Amino acid sequence: MKKILFIIPCVPYPLNSGGNQAFFQMVDYIRHKMSVSVLFYAWTIDEAKRVEKLEDLWEDVDFYTFVKETKEEPDSPLVRNPFYYKWLKKLKMSIERKMRRQLLSTSNSTVDLLKDKDFVREKSVLPNSVYKEFDTRYIDYVTKVAHTGFDIIQVEFYELIALGYVLPQNVQTIFVHHELRYIRNENEMNLFQAIRPSDRMNFLVAKDFEWNALQKYKHIIALTEVDRLLLASYLGREDHIYASPAVVKFESNSETEFIPCVHRRFTFVGYGEHFPNLDAVVWLCKEIVPYLRKCNFEFTLQVVGMGYERYSAELRTACPEIELVGLMAIKSVMV
């Protein structure tokens, strides 16, 4: 049986996002056909504990978890009084949190939210698209695990694209490109209120980095046929570039009963940190809600999904009809 290692930049549990659900479905399917191992990057100890849930569900899968946050920092400096130093660190973190809250509160106005903010630039991934150095402990860990006899190593998400430089050359390496970063950067830049010279520089440097990093993988998987064709043009070749089949199964013959609307409720579903979802909610509050009020139309604007907490007060001030309901657990979807 072939041995495959998946490397992803998070712990995909609980299943409270589309990405987590898709990865869960994929591993749940392929573990019956291959010997599966998964290497997670956990930002905190609490996040690492979620792996225990997956271990209970998949007893036939091997898990490797790198934890960025540790109880004791291995490279902590030598200090005269460790207890006093620890207290000062906590005080510093507390002060920084209070400073951040002050910054948010001073910009907490409806005018800022609906008119003055450049949401596209604020949420843009362009500044994070150029190579950022990894934790050396993580690179050592990935290298060690990757050289333990796998037939296939699959890396997912742009955050980890540079790992191709440290993977063994005698295995089949795959990069799953969930979103072509240079395309997203180009699309976002076109929506900036103004494009700066530094934006153009970052775009070109990131585009070159993405091209070179992809050369380190023997196979590349895009999520759509459109992205596959774009990648082929971008890389100058079509071989070993594939479009991924759908993983989630749907009942094609199931009939859905039409239920007429009985509530005057508009529902928007989407994670606020994913562009352009927040921008869309702001657009609804700015362009659509005033028109509905003018027509004396009573309604509720329900927003399902996380990522709107930072602007909750502003959104409710601008649109009292809004309901930020967060996540809604549906048994048929959640595990």
What are these regions (language model features)?
Residues 3, 28, 140-153, 161-174, ...:
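Glycosyltransferases and closely related glycan-assembly transferases
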Residues 174, 200-206, 211, 215-254:
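Donor nucleotide-sugar binding/catalytic pocket of nucleotide-sugar-dependent glycosyltransferases
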Residues 211-215, 314, 329-335:
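Short acidic alpha-helix that forms the nucleotide-activated donor recognition element
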Residues 243-330:
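Conserved catalytic-core segment of nucleotide-activated headgroup transferases in glycan assembly
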Residues 82-152, 158-161, 193-217:
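Conserved nucleotide-sugar donor-binding subdomain of glycosyltransferases
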Residues 1-72, 79, 89-93, 291-295:
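N-terminal subdomain of nucleotide-sugar transferases
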Residues 4, 8, 167-191:
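Active-site proximal beta-strand in glycosyltransferases
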